[in-house]
Design a protein with these regions (language model features):
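A structural preference for short, pocket-lining loop segments at secondary-structure junctions
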Residues: 54-56, 60
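N-terminal helical cap/lid subdomain that shapes the substrate entry/recognition surface
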Residues: 1-52, 68
């Protein structure tokens, strides 16, 4: 609520802190339910890896609440994938003490699947995600993301591999 008060003061909103908070959450819910989309061809990567019987984990610094909103309400996403069917493991910020770039979330994946880092490959779209994979000692494929474009050179330098999109990655794994 203090943050909403800060926004009110910073931007001169005529709304009170509570109204700013309500408006913020309304916009956020709309974004989660209707705007967020999978990266193009992501579902094809998921299908290809599942066809090869490779267990998949979804690891995210977002909240479980947001993941559930994507799954339950976002037709852009749930028309293409099923979180429950497509991922053997889903870990969110609530499952770890330390979020990315700390390696904890990826170390938990290794432990869950009882595998070594050399038997795992991470697909990431952010610098902190690439750093988390590096910190866990796991090879990482970075994929271009418009929201990480300002860090693209660092991402390319720290990732083991870089692809522009999932179509490019699909050519290597199919």
């Amino acid at each position: 609520l203090e943050y909403c008060g800060y926004l009110k003061e910073l931007y001169g909103f005529e709304l009170n802190k509570e109204d700013v908070k309500n408006r913020r959450y309304s916009i956020s819910r709309h974004f989660l339910d209707h705007v967020v989309e999978l990266k193009p061809q992501a579902e094809l990567i998921i299908q290809a890896l599942k066809k090869q019987e490779i267990p998949l984990a979804l690891t995210t610094t977002t909240s479980l609440f947001n993941v559930q909103r994507y799954q339950d309400n976002n037709q852009n996403i749930n028309a293409k994938i099923s979180f429950d069917d497509d991922f053997a493991l889903i870990l969110t910020r609530e499952n770890v003490q330390n979020i990315k770039p700390h390696p904890e979330i990826y170390l938990n994946v290794l432990e869950h699947f009882k595998i070594e880092a050399k038997d795992c490959l991470i697909i990431e779209d952010s610098l902190i995600g690439v750093e988390a994979a590096n910190n866990a000692g796991i090879e990482v494929v970075a994929i271009y993301d418009q929201y990480s474009a300002h860090e693209i050179e660092l991402i390319k330098a720290r990732a083991n591999y870089f692809v522009q999109d999932f179509t490019e990655l699909l050519r290597h794994i199919a």
